[in-house]
């Protein structure tokens, strides 16, 4: 499996793992916010009546705080470039029943990945990321 490239100059990731909710219910909310701006996303999530919106709200708020801390960018300039929900493990419990028997209960969990992109910054070239600068002799004419 190939690893996807991550441009740390203009993007910030945030992960939430083992959230006790099915991935299908989370995707219903995530599909509404993918590709929107940070401020618009927070307004949408506050007004949604679903239980899944609160963990996503907290995660996006955390990702914006990471962006302002690491890159020094404004939260208003952020855009949700990637929002992904994957299935996690099942929490397994036993429910006691009649005559000393027990029934298994499987509660699904999910993992969320949010990537915020800064609209105001431009991505750096390969040479700028590798050497920290670009000289006119490096480019070649």
Curated annotation (Swiss-Prot):
GO terms for cellular component: chloroplast; large ribosomal subunit. GO terms for molecular function: rRNA binding; structural constituent of ribosome. InterPro entries: Ribosomal_uL22, Ribosomal_uL22_bac/chlpt-type, Ribosomal_uL22_bac/org-type, Ribosomal_uL22_CS, Ribosomal_uL22_sf. Signal peptide: none annotated. It is found in: Plastid, Chloroplast. Keywords: Chloroplast, Plastid, Ribonucleoprotein, Ribosomal protein, RNA-binding, rRNA-binding. GO terms for biological process: translation. The keyword Acetylation does not apply. Belongs to the universal ribosomal protein uL22 family. This protein binds specifically to 23S rRNA. The globular domain of the protein is located near the polypeptide exit tunnel on the outside of the subunit, while an extended beta-hairpin is found that lines the wall of the exit tunnel in the center of the 70S ribosome. Part of the 50S ribosomal subunit. This is Large ribosomal subunit protein uL22c. It comes from Chloranthus spicatus (Chulantree).
């Amino acid at each position: 499996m190939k690893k996807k490239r991550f441009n740390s100059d203009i993007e910030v990731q945030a992960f939430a793992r083992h959230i006790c909710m099915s991935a299908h219910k989370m995707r219903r909310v995530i599909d509404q916010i993918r590709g929107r701006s940070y401020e618009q996303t927070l307004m949408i999530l506050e007004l949604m009546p679903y239980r899944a919106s609160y963990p996503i709200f907290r995660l996006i708020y955390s990702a914006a705080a990471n962006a302002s801390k690491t890159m020094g960018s404004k939260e208003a300039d952020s855009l949700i470039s990637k929002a992904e929900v994957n299935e996690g493990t099942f929490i397994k419990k036993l429910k006691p029943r009649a005559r000393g028997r027990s029934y298994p209960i499987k509660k699904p969990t999910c993992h969320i990945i949010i990537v915020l992109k800064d609209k105001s910054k431009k991505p750096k070239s390969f040479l700028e990321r590798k050497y920290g600068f670009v000289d006119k002799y490096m480019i070649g004419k």
